């Protein structure tokens, strides 16, 4: 089933409603990080170039649903877009019963979460949104895993529902990485808990040639290999699960390597003293905060020979420089690799920024939860809706 792409449609004189992910941090009425806004601009500009009357909607923050709260208003986003597009952009507050929008004009709807029924994918709300447009464009990969009125319901009732360029690009990149990857395929999965990424680990262990674990997740695997992890964050109840994942990987000719050396400290703080130890020398009072240089080099070698790399999560507490060397080395290896690489997840993107490798990663995914669910092999509600409408 093919998804209709906005770029293939004739939008001349059409009312086009675009769902973007414009959920950006705002301080004192000013946008403080504009990455998502910048990513959405080409879609808005393309709709204008195609002669459309453009309406844009998004959520911002987590207001109480159904209640207006100026703290979560889209006004700062409107101000930003007006500057970026060098043309007036209007904020529409009461838009559900109809909104005037001319060809060549951009109107931004007030926060969709101010509408009662948004999160529950309310049918009546979805139909009201759908009645506002000739074409609905889903372009928000970051919210594609949520079945809500503005991301899913509206698309079921709009005359035409299609994918925007940003969403299409994201699905193509993820498809390239997961559906028919160049081998060997390496996945690096970090983060604090095995429990939150268990389904990702299970799904990836079935398709990758090499699964690399880092962060708190690695501590559970270190414990599963019979080593002391001291006071480190780990999940004792998931040790058997970790052993099963290792056995699965090995049965396919792969592995989930455990660090041979680690960086430890006695406390979790920006000023904690880092000590390098062999993984077999970790004491009861130690906390593991990073992989050591030998382990980092071994992982860098695995990355060097990869054909496809999926990176989700740092391998240490890189926010503190003394525990960032492992993640820095991994980032460098990915940057130097000729493989198709895709990185996603908030902490991962922070590491990509910190070590300045954004232009060396083949594709940076804008979605956090959606990226994870895609890796888990789940069909995202927004994608299912677009396939249904494209059939």
UniProtKB/Swiss-Prot annotation:
Catalytic activity as recorded in UniProt: (2R)-3-phosphoglycerate + ATP = (2R)-3-phospho-glyceroyl phosphate + ADP
GO aspect biological process, one term: gluconeogenesis
Places the protein is found: Cytoplasm
Coarse class of the protein's main subcellular location: cytoplasm
InterPro entries named in the record: Phosphoglycerate_kinase (IPR001576), Phosphoglycerate_kinase_CS (IPR015911), Phosphoglycerate_kinase_N (IPR015824), Phosphoglycerate_kinase_sf (IPR036043)
Pathway noted in the entry: Carbohydrate degradation; glycolysis; pyruvate from D-glyceraldehyde 3-phosphate: step 2/5
Positions annotated to bind ATP: 197, 319, 345-348
Gene Ontology CC: one annotated term: cytosol
Pfam families tied to this protein: PGK
Gene3D superfamilies: Phosphoglycerate kinase, N-terminal domain (3.40.50.1260)
Plastid as UniProt keyword: no
UniProt xrefs under PROSITE patterns: PGLYCERATE_KINASE
Protein name: Phosphoglycerate kinase
Tree of life domain: Bacteria
Residues annotated to bind substrate: 21-23, 36, 59-62, 113, 146
Keyword terms of this UniProt record: ATP-binding, Cytoplasm, Glycolysis, Kinase, Nucleotide-binding, Transferase
Coiled coil regions in record: none
Subunit composition and interactions: Monomer.
Catalytic class of the enzyme: transferase
Family: Belongs to the phosphoglycerate kinase family.
Keyword Cytoplasm annotated: yes
């Amino acid at each position: 089933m093919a998804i209709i792409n906005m770029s293939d449609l004739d939008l001349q004189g059409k009312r086009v409603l675009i769902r973007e992910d414009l959920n950006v941090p705002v301080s004192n009425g000013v946008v403080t990080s504009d990455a998502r806004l910048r990513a959405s601009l080409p879609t808005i500009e393309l709709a204008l170039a195609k002669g459309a009357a453009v309406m844009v909607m998004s959520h911002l923050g987590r207001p109480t649903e159904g209640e207006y709260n100026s703290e979560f208003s889209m006004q700062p986003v409107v101000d930003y877009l007006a500057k970026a597009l060098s043309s007036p952009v209007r904020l529409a507050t009461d838009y559900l019963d109809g909104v005037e929008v001319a060809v060549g004009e951009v109107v931004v709807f007030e926060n969709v979460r101010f509408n009662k029924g948004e999160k529950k994918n309310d049918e009546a709300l979805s139909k009201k949104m759908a009645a506002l447009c000739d074409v609905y464009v889903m372009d928000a990969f970051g919210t594609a895993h949520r079945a809500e009125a503005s991301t899913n319901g509206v698309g079921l009732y709009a005359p035409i529902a299609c994918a925007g360029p940003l969403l299409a690009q994201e699905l193509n990149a993820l498809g390239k990485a997961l559906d028919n990857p160049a081998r060997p395929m390496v996945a690096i999965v970090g983060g604090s808990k095995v429990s939150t990424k268990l389904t990702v680990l299970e799904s990836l262990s079935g398709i990758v040639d090499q699964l690399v674990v880092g962060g708190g997740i690695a501590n559970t695997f270190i414990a599963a290999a019979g080593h002391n992890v001291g006071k480190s964050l780990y999940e004792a109840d998931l040790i058997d699960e970790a052993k099963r994942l290792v056995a699965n990987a090995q049965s396919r000719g792969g592995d989930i390597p455990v660090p041979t050396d680690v960086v430890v400290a006695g406390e979790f703080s920006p000023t904690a003293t880092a000590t390098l130890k062999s993984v077999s020398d970790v004491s009861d009072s130690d906390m593991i905060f990073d992989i050591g240089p030998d382990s980092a080099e071994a992982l860098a070698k695995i990355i060097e020979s990869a054909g496809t790399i999926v990176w989700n999560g740092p391998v240490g507490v890189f926010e503190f420089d003394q525990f960032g060397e492992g993640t820095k080395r991994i980032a460098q290896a990915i940057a130097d690799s000729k493989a198709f690489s895709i990185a996603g997840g908030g902490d991962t993107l922070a590491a990509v920024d910190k070590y300045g490798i954004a232009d060396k990663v083949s594709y940076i995914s804008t979605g956090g939860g959606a990226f994870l669910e895609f890796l888990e092999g789940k069909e995202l509600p927004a994608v299912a809706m677009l396939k249904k409408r494209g059939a």
